[in-house]
């Protein structure tokens, strides 16, 4: 079998040469390649294949290397036997059987948790009850911590009494006498002296009993005590000898003072305030002038009727 020499100088460009080179490239076998995953599986899962590969390499160097084209053709016709990966279910079962419970509890990683969840769908449902879960691991840690705290506080561990059901039933049947009061257990109290102690002060100390003339306050706070009426002192007659500085009268209803401080009668003072000049003497009267005012108890109609009667009586006269 002739081997193709790829290093010979190529002839000038032509249609025939290009077609020949294309056919030669198409007929050239492509060596098989392995993915990274298959290579890892070869090294980790199939140790026998690794030894076989090392033996074949030793024979290869001892016998001599064949030509490159013959090696490529042999690989294309008869590819090397690849490692057969185990099934997913078998792999899950093997991993679950190989992992011990102690190691599983010591390292609860997320990978173990993921493998466990996938394996639960593949294994028998009765096996799932005995298989620990990630939540069980956390609960076991919490329970162990609580039991340790209880053992620190109490002299006897409570877990031993809780695990034994017979002891639990016995404790329920036993009477609980902690809160029962038994007077026979207590000694009777005997006072040292039988004579009563004398009272220091037998008389009552309440202020109501000590005061003889005390009057208690009224019971109803809303009822106020009657207050005595204050008597108004009589006004001092300071104007008994007063004389009006304008009209020289001694009788008036009210004495007033002008701007200069002089004493004036009521008529003269009001006239000055209204007209801004002194009251003339021609307007002076001997008596006190009063207005004709109706009484407070009289109605206005009766007052008008009385005025008309007076005017009619005066006209008849």
Curated annotation (Swiss-Prot):
Annotated tissue distribution: Expressed in head, trunk and tail. Expression decreases with age in the hypodermal cells and the pharyngeal-intestinal valve cells in the head, eventually showing little or no expression in about 14 day old worms. Expressed in hypodermal, but not in intestinal, cells at 1 day of age. Expression in the hypodermal and intestinal cells in the trunk region decreases quickly between day 3 and day 5 of adulthood. Expression in the tail between days 3 and 14 stays approximately uniform.
Pfam families: GATA
Region span, Disordered: 1-34, 290-317
Top-level taxon of origin: Eukaryota
UniProt key word Transcription: yes
Name of this chain's protein: Transcription factor elt-3
Species this chain originates from: Caenorhabditis elegans
GO biological process: cell fate commitment; determination of adult lifespan; lysosome organization; negative regulation of transcription by RNA polymerase II; positive regulation of transcription by RNA polymerase II; regulation of transcription by RNA polymerase II; response to osmotic stress; response to oxidative stress
Subunit structure: Interacts with skn-1; interaction may enhance transcriptional activation of target genes.
Inducing or repressing factors: Repressed during adulthood by normal aging.
Role this protein plays: Transcription factor. Required, in concert with signal transducer and transcription factor sta-2, for up-regulation of the vacuolar H(+)-ATPase and acceleration of lysosome maturation at molt. Involved in regulating hypodermal development, perhaps acting downstream of transcription factor elt-1. Modulates environmentally induced changes in collagen gene expression, including rol-6, sqt-1, lon-3, and dpy-13. Involved in regulating expression of various genes, including gst-4, sod-3, ugt-9, and col-144. In response to oxidative stress, required to up-regulate expression of gst-4 mRNA.
GO cellular component term of the entry, any: nucleus
Subcellular location: Nucleus
ZnF (GATA-type) intervals: 244-268
